[in-house]
Amino acid sequence: MACINPDGKPTESGTKMLRALKSGLGSPEEIAKEAGLPLFRVRSGLRELTQAGLANQKDEKYELTEKGTELIE
């Protein structure tokens, strides 16, 4: 399941992951728990969100970019 629609906007699961990241850095496990999504979906979704410029990876954790923050406000 994709996290980014063809129009560049996040899907429902993508939005859940972005909202889970809103509070700060999060590991895939923390994001999965907060978003209520399976870990395998979060891992693949984070790759998509990072490639789309909506999230950044720092070591083993992720954070929202300015672009990602704007999409969920």
Regions found by a protein language model. Give the residues of each.
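A cross-family signal for key residues in well-ordered alpha-helices
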Residues: 19
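A short, conserved structural fragment
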Residues: 50-60
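Short alpha-helical segments that sit at the start of domains
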Residues: 1-16, 39
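Short amphipathic alpha-helical interaction segments
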Residues: 37-48
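Short capping segments at the starts of secondary-structure elements
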Residues: 23-27
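A short acidic, leucine-rich amphipathic alpha-helix
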Residues: 30-33
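Minor-groove-contacting beta-hairpin "wing" of winged helix-turn-helix DNA-binding domains
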Residues: 60-67
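Short, amphipathic alpha-helical interaction segments positioned at domain boundaries
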Residues: 69-73
